[in-house]
Amino acid sequence: MKILLLTLVVVTIVCLDLAYTRTCFRTPYKPETCPPGQNLCYKKSWCDAFCSSRGKVIELGCTAKCPTVKDGKDITCCATDNCNTVANWKSR
């Protein structure tokens, strides 16, 4: 009986650990596992005072709901692992 109980506990723990979680690129540019409930990746970009010399500021991360678009900001959301890439950056 003890062996059966122990087996059930081990199986439960293994099943809970196998729950799928999204992986997104985060700022700084590296892939990370998203917190529970955050199943979307996003890429937000905008111009600041240095936009003409450095280019747009880019923010990457995980979210539960795609952020609302505000004036001057571009927001893209996606729902596959590491889908919020930046064209000129390389993963390290």
UniProtKB/Swiss-Prot annotation:
Tagged with keyword Transferase: no
Record keywords, A-Z: Acetylcholine receptor inhibiting toxin, Disulfide bond, Ion channel impairing toxin, Neurotoxin, Postsynaptic neurotoxin, Secreted, Signal, Toxin
PROSITE patterns tied to this protein: SNAKE_TOXIN
Cleaved signal peptide residues: 1-21
A molecular-function term among this protein's GO annotations: acetylcholine receptor inhibitor activity
One Pfam family it belongs to: Toxin_cobra-type
Disulfides per UniProt: C24-C41, C34-C62, C47-C51, C66-C77, C78-C83
Family per similarity comment: Belongs to the three-finger toxin family. Long-chain subfamily. Type II alpha-neurotoxin sub-subfamily.
Protein name per UniProt: Long neurotoxin 1
